[in-house]
Design a protein with these regions (language model features):
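Histidine-centered metal-chelating micro-motifs
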Residues: 18-20, 24, 56, 60-67
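A short, N-terminal "cap"/entry segment at the start of jelly-roll beta-barrel domains
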Residues: 1-7, 49, 56-57, 85
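Extracellular/periplasmic catalytic domains that process cell-envelope and extracellular macromolecules
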Residues: 25-26, 33, 69-73
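Ligand-binding loop in jelly-roll beta-barrel domains
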Residues: 40, 60-85
């Protein structure tokens, strides 16, 4: 895919932290894998908790924000396809 690159990032969410604001994934599809802890994904008015293992896909229809409601750090690996800078 000319002009694009595969990006992999690791995020650590401290207990009580929020990853926002509300954002979308138009133009940068991806997926998330949870390594440790629990992350709550908020989309379409629904909060879904994900623990260690496969998380969620992110596509052109994804608009969401995330938080760690737990008492321990949550760690995720996020992989997406982005336009090359």
């Amino acid at each position: 895919m000319a002009g694009y690159e595969l990006r992999m990032r690791r995020f650590t969410f401290a207990p009580g932290s929020v990853f926002g604001p509300l954002h979308d994934h138009r133009g940068r599809p991806g997926l998330v894998y949870i390594l440790e802890g629990t992350i709550t994904d908020h989309r379409d008015g629904i909060a879904t908790e994900y623990g260690p293992g496969p998380g969620w896909p992110e596509d052109r229809n994804t608009t969401h924000w995330l938080e760690n409601r737990g008492t321990v750090p949550a760690i995720e690996v996020s992989v997406d396809i982005v336009r090359r800078a």
